[in-house]
Amino acid sequence: MASQPPPPPKPWETRRIPGTGPGPGPGPTFQSAELGPTLLTRPGQPTLTRVPPPILPRPSQQTGSGNLNTFRPAYSSFSSGYGAYGNSFYGSYSPYSYGYNGLGYNRLRIDDLPPSRFVQQAEESSRGAFQSIESIVHAFASVSMMMDATFSAVYNSFRAVLDVANHFSRLKIHFTKVFSAFALVRTIRYLYRRLQWMIGLRRGLENEDLWAESEGTVACLGAEDRAANSAKSWPIFLFFAVILGGPYLIWKLLSTHSDEVTDSTNWASGEDDHVVARAEYDFVAVSEEEISFRAGDMLNLALKEQQPRVRGWLLASLDGQTTGLIPANYVKILGKRRGRKTVESSRISKQQQSFTNTTLIKGATAADSLDDQEAAFESVFVETNKVPVASDSTGKNGDKQDL
């Protein structure tokens, strides 16, 4: 009879560390095959990795993302057109309605992979030049739009004046037709005046009435001619006034806007007050509205009044020049820091205050010394006055003695 194999060991008869080898056991192994054999881990303990928090919806996916144009201009500002000036001459023609996307190039390719580091560096280095070119093109396009809008406004005003004149001429025709119904009254009046002249009750008045009527007619014709000449020239003067004054106003507005933009971005370089934050996780930007950073980088954040109204995103700067949006849950706020301008102004004010106090002290000392000198001078003056008085009294006494 063949011998039977020994029965398998009972669970309490074998003692094995969980997760140390294959086979049935109370727990699986937690070591990943991708980490390799060089990674030292304790048996039965999981490998902990720091997972970044989820990113909130990006600014382009949120409503109201048009507020981002305050710090990142684009060509989409030309897509409004001239619908407000639509008329029979211009219609709804909009030469600036194509925008940037009409060229078949989409700068915000969210569905594609993020660009390489070389592309990002090239874009960062050439962004200033392209922004300058964009501002120049923006200025020329604004002037062209201004001239187009001016022509449309002048033409519409001219058409409105013509319509008003047409209505007045029609009203005059209607009143003429109404007054022609009273021709019988004028005929009776003429016969009555003729009868008075034949009887002798009215003499020489008819000629005077004719002369007065002729003078009134000539005066009316002269006024109408002057009004017609002035009406022909006012559109030309209005057009040239707008053409000459428009570029100056645009230049003033653009210069004011550039100054405001420069002042509003001084926080990025630390000139104005700003908020300091430290990056907790790595972040890679996928659009020009965002900036990339690594864990441990120090970021300058704009103040609350200058932050765009985008939920979960903050306006920040890494290098002091380029500004962009970063996720708020990827950074840790350290606190508010005063700008260099504020520190320098406070230091200058303190120096001026100390200098003023020193000047006051010196002035008080000089005033005291001046008072002492005046008192000494007055004492000497009093003594010199007393000496002649004494001599006079002596002389008088001598005279008295002589007498």
Curated annotation (Swiss-Prot):
Residue ranges annotated as Peroxisomal matrix topological domain: 1-134, 193-233
Coiled coil: none
Region annotation Disordered: where it falls in the sequence: 1-69
PANTHER family attached to this UniProt entry: PEROXISOMAL MEMBRANE PROTEIN PEX13
Keyword Amino-acid biosynthesis: no
Subunit structure: Interacts (via SH3 domain) with PEX14 (via SH3-binding motif); forming the PEX13-PEX14 docking complex. Interacts with PEX19.
Membrane topology reported for the UniProt record: Multi-pass membrane protein
Localisation per UniProt entry: Peroxisome membrane
Region feature (Interaction with PEX19): 175-196
Predominant cellular place of this UniProt entry's protein: membrane
A single GO molecular function term of this UniProt record: protein transmembrane transporter activity
Bias-annotated ranges (Pro residues): 1-11
InterPro entries from the UniProt entry: Peroxin-13_N (IPR007223), Pex13 (IPR035463), SH3-like_dom_sf (IPR036028), SH3_domain (IPR001452)
Originating gene: PEX13
Protein name per UniProt: Peroxisomal membrane protein PEX13
Role according to the record: Component of the PEX13-PEX14 docking complex, a translocon channel that specifically mediates the import of peroxisomal cargo proteins bound to PEX5 receptor. The PEX13-PEX14 docking complex forms a large import pore which can be opened to a diameter of about 9 nm. Mechanistically, PEX5 receptor along with cargo proteins associates with the PEX14 subunit of the PEX13-PEX14 docking complex in the cytosol, leading to the insertion of the receptor into the organelle membrane with the concomitant translocation of the cargo into the peroxisome matrix.
Transmembrane segments: 135-155, 175-192, 234-254
Organism whose genome encodes this protein: Bos taurus
GO cellular component, one term: peroxisomal importomer complex
GO terms (BP aspect): protein import into peroxisome matrix, docking
Sequence segments annotated as region (Targeting to peroxisomes): 145-233
Pfam families found in the cross-reference section: Peroxin-13_N (PF04088), SH3_9 (PF14604)
